[in-house]
Amino acid sequence: MATEEMKKLATVMAIGTANPPNCYYQADFPDFYFRVTNSDHLINLKQKFKRLCENSRIEKRYLHVTEEILKENPNIAAYEATSLNVRHKMQVKGVAELGKEAALKAIKEWGQPKSKITHLIVCCLAGVDMPGADYQLTKLLDLDPSVKRFMFYHLGCYAGGTVLRLAKDIAENNKGARVLIVCSEMTTTCFRGPSETHLDSMIGQAILGDGAAAVIVGADPDLTVERPIFELVSTAQTIVPESHGAIEGHLLESGLSFHLYKTVPTLISNNIKTCLSDAFTPLNISDWNSLFWIAHPGGPAILDQVTAKVGLEKEKLKVTRQVLKDYGNMSSATVFFIMDEMRKKSLENGQATTGEGLEWGVLFGFGPGITVETVVLRSVPVIS
C-alpha cells in the first residue's frame, strides 16, 4: 500500500475522543428524565418514552446536563420555555473544553510539536459565537496564532464526513499541511421536557449523547515519526431526493428544536446503493460486504434498513452498533469514535489492517437535508 501514489493521499494520523463525566444508563433514564422535567404525571407519554429507550439499543450515554444544572435553570427542563441565553452560555464554554480534551489526546498520539499544525477545522451543532470555538481552541491548545481556521456550526449528524472532505482537500493541496479536526457536540442546547404534541422531539432525548473527537490529517506522512491509520481516497456529498424537511433543526428562544419524519430510515436506505456505486465504481468494487463500514448511527432503524437494503452481513456494522450502544448518537463526532474503535479492535483481534483486516472501506454521514457524506477509506497494515 505504501506506493508513491498512496503517499500523496491524505491520511488520518491520530484520533482522540472525550466525553463529559456524567454517565446515564438507558434503563434508568426515563425515570430520571420525567422526574427532572416535572413530567411524571404524563403516564402514557412516559411509557412511550420507555419504549423508545428500550428499542434504542443504547446502554449508556454521557451528558453535560445534570440534575443540579436543571434545578438551577428550570427553564431548560421545560418544553418550550425561554432558555436560549443560559443554554448558549453553557454550550460555548463546554464545547471548547470538551474539544480541548479530545484534541490533546490526538496531539499526544501524533507525537509531533503543536507548531506543525497548520490548519484547524472545528465543528459543533450549536454555540454560535464571535470569536468562535475555533478561536477558543486555538487559545486553549496554545496553537500558533497564524494557524488557518475553519468553523462549522449547525451541520448536524453528517458533518463528520464534511470535515474529512475539507481536510483532505487542504492536506493534498498544501505541501506539509497538518490539519487538526475537532468535532465537539453537546446536547445542552436541545435538552427539554417531553411534549404530547411533538413526539419526534422525544427521539432526540432518547438517543443523543455528548462527545468530542479530534483527528489529525496530513498527506505524504513522514513514516519515521508519523503513523497513518486510514487513507482518505475520495469524498462526495449529496442530497437525498424527495427528502426536503425530513430532518430539520431550528434554533428558537427555547433552544434547538428537532423535527424528524418517520420515513427517514427508508429515505436513507433507498438511496445508499447509489452513493456506494458512485463512490466505488471507479475502483471496480461492487461487493459491499468486501468493505469495512463506518456509518453514522442515526438510530437502530437506519442501521437495520441499510443492512437489509444493501444485503450486508450482520457483522459489518458491529463496531458502529457498539459505539451506539456505549455512547448514543453524538452527531458529527460519532464516526470518529467508530473509526477509533475499529482500529483498536483490529489490533486486539490480530487482524492484518486497521479496517478489520480488509483493504477498502466506506464512511457515511447522514443528517439534515437529508444530506449524505460518503468517504472512501483505505486501511493500512496494523503495526503492533
UniProtKB/Swiss-Prot annotation:
Q: Which InterPro entries match?
A: Chalcone/stilbene_synt_C (IPR012328), Chalcone/stilbene_synt_N (IPR001099), Polyketide_synthase_type-III (IPR011141), Thiolase-like (IPR016039)
**What gene codes for this chain?**
BAS
Sequence similarity: Belongs to the thiolase-like superfamily. Chalcone/stilbene synthases family.
Q: Write the protein's name.
A: Polyketide synthase BAS
Q: What is the recorded phenotype of mutating residue 190 to G/T?
A: Normal benzalacetone synthase activity
* Pathway given in the UniProt record: Secondary metabolite biosynthesis; flavonoid biosynthesis
Extract the GO molecular function terms from the UniProt entry.
acyltransferase activity, transferring groups other than amino-acyl groups; protein homodimerization activity
State the oligomer form and interacting partners.
Homodimer.
Q: Which organism is it from?
A: Rheum palmatum
How sensitive is activity to pH? Answer: Optimum pH is 8.0-8.8.
Q: What does this protein do?
A: Polyketide synthase producing 4-hydroxybenzalacetone. Can use p-coumaryl-CoA as substrate but does not accept hexanoyl-CoA, isobutyryl-CoA, isovaleryl-CoA, and acetyl-CoA as a substrates. Catalyzes the initial key reaction step in the biosynthesis of phenylbutanoids.
Query: Which Pfam family name is an example for this entry?
Result: Chal_sti_synt_C
Keywords of this entry = Acyltransferase, Chromophore, Hydroxylation, Transferase
CDD domains, from UniProt? CHS_like
EC number(s) recorded for this UniProt protein: 2.3.1.212
